[in-house]
Structure formats: structure tokens, C-alpha cells
Amino acid sequence: MEDSEEHHFSSVEEETRYWKELAMKYKQCAENIQEELCEFQEGSREYEAELETQLQQTESRNRDLLSENNRLRIELESVKEKFEMQHSEWYRQVSALEDDLAQTKAIKDQLQKYIRELEQANDDLERAKRAAIMSLEDFEQRLNQAIERNAFLESELDEKENLLESVQRLKDEARDLRQELAVQQKQEKPKTPMRTSLETERTDTAVQASLSLPSTPSLHRAPNINIPTPATFRRGFEDSYCATPLTPAARISALNIMGDLLRKVGALESKLASCRNFVYDQSPDRTTVSMYMNRDALETRMSPHQPLCDTGLVKRLEFGTRPSSTPGPMSHPSQSVVKMLL
């Protein structure tokens, strides 16, 4: 309309031609559009079919994915449950292991403390062992000393028994001599007058001087050793044997003393005959000497410190056998003989 209004045709034919050309143009355009529409519809149908196939595929795939998703969700739930169970189990195990670790640490501390105590106790036991070893060695040393002392004492006891036998033999001889003297005193009568007071005093002085023997070295004594001796021994003789083991020098000295005493006893026995001549041939002298000898012997028996050998010698002088019939010697040699015997 606008074109018609804008265009001013000069004739009707021109206007008809114009409108024919315009109709042909629009018709050609409509045909083109119709062709395009057909092509579009055909492409749309193809595309729709393709989309439907894709939709079906997508739906089937979606269904598969949903089923897979459900399956995976179920598996996830089961895995979660398993994980929870394993987590709780692991937590319990970790808690138990922590408790065990704490207990192990406590036990380790206790064991370390116990080890220290054992080491201290071991040190104490080692010290006690060393002390026991030292005390045992000391005890063994003392035991060996005691064994040696006992062996020495046994030898001394053997010597003492021998001396006791000798003393008993001398006592038996003295008893026999005493009995013989008693018989002789009953049978004999006085043959010479009594001594004067001066001679008696001189004889007393000689006998008293003869009783004091030269001192000999005493035996080595040590305390705390007691040996039982018979009741017949004097205290001095007991003290000489009641001692600890003697040193070699003291033992030799003691043996020398005993040997000297035994030699003196033998010498006294050999010289007894010469004394008997004076004692029994001169009756007044015999009576006086016997009186003083009896008194000295009694004092010797009463004295606790007088050695046993002196008592035996006095008894041998006091009780003698009957002398042989020989001429009587003078008074002065007899006094020297008494001194030698004593």
C-alpha cells in the first residue's frame, strides 16, 4: 500500500505490470519459503527421530546410571558401616594398645627400680661375701692355730703323763722307804749322845739353806688356756702347764728344765747311799735331821707355790732305806751331801 501510494503510475498497464511483477516476486519468495519449510520439516523430523533415539539411549543410560548409583549408594552404606565398625575396632585396639603401653611403661619402671634394688642387694651380698670370706679365713687361721696348739698340748699331756708316772713311781718308792724306815726306827736304839744346841742350829741352817734351790727359767705362759690336772699336783705345777701353745724357745727351755730335773733326780738316787750312812749311823744326828726334814716337808706340802719336784726330793730324804754298814762320816761332809740332795 505504501508502495502504491508512493509510486505514481502513469498508466494502468504500467500499474498492472508492476503489480504482476510484485506478485511473481512474492510467489517466488513463497515457493522458496515453502521449499525451505519442507526442508526444515524434513530436517526437523530427522532431528526429532535422532533426538528420540538419543533420548531413549539417554534414558536407558540414565536408568543404568541410576541403578549403578543405587548399587554404589548401597555399597557406600555398607562400606560406611564397615568403616564405622573397623574404626570402632581400631579405636578399641588403639585404646587397648595405649593401655598396654602404659602398663608396659609402668612395668618397665618397676623393673628398673627392682633392678636397682637387686644391684644394691647384690652389692650388699658381695660385701657380706667378702666379709664372710675374710671371717672364714680368720676362722681357718684360728682353727689351724688351735689345731697346732692342741697338737702341742697333746704332746705336753703325753710328757705330763710320763712325769706323772715318774712321780707315782717315786711316791711308791717313798712309801716303801717310809715303811722300811718305820720298821728300822723300831728296831734301832740310840748309839751316840744328843747333839749340842750349836750343832743342831748349824744343821738346821744347812737344811734350810739346802731347801732353796737355784731358780730356773719359768715356762712361757699365755692366758685363756686351761688344762685339767690331777688333784695331787701343786698350783705352781698346774700353772706351768695351764698355758697356751709355747713358742719354740719357751718349749725348748721347758724341756731343758724338765730334763735337768730328771737328771737331778737320777743324781739324787745315786747319792742317796752316802746320805744314808750319815743319817742312820749317827742316831742323834739322824733324829735331829729327821725332825727338821719332817718340818720342812710339812711346810713344803702346805706351800701352794712350792714345786712338786722339791716335795718329792724332801720325801726321798725323809724316808730312806736302811744304810749299809759303813763307818760314819763327819758332820760337815754330811751337811754338804744334804745340800746336794736337796
Curated annotation (Swiss-Prot):
Q: Which GO terms describe its biological process?
A: cell division; cell migration; centrosome duplication; centrosome localization; chromosome segregation; establishment of chromosome localization; establishment of mitotic spindle orientation; microtubule nucleation
- What are the entry keywords? Cell cycle, Cell division, Centromere, Chromosome, Coiled coil, Cytoplasm, Cytoplasmic vesicle, Cytoskeleton, Kinetochore, Membrane, Microtubule, Mitosis, Phosphoprotein
Compositionally biased, Polar residues: which spans? 322-342
Interaction with PAFAH1B1: where is this region? 89-157
Main localization (coarse): cytoplasm
Any one Pfam family match given in the protein's UniProt record, by short name: NUDE_C
Spell out the coiled coil positions from the record.
45-189
Q: Does the keyword Ligase apply?
A: no
Single GO molecular-function term?
A: microtubule binding
The answer to whether the entry has keyword Coiled coil is yes
GO CC, sorted alphabetically, is: centrosome; cleavage furrow; cytoplasmic vesicle membrane; kinesin complex; kinetochore; microtubule; spindle pole centrosome
Describe how it is modified after translation: Phosphorylated in mitosis.
Where does it reside? Cytoplasm, Cytoskeleton; Cytoplasm, Cytoskeleton, Microtubule organizing center, Centrosome; Cytoplasm, Cytoskeleton, Spindle; Chromosome, Centromere, Kinetochore
- Subunit structure, interactors included: Self-associates. Interacts with PAFAH1B1.
Protein name listed in UniProt: Nuclear distribution protein nudE homolog 1
Q: Which organism is this entry from?
A: Gallus gallus (Chicken)
Q: What is the lineage of its organism?
A: Eukaryota, Metazoa, Chordata, Craniata, Vertebrata
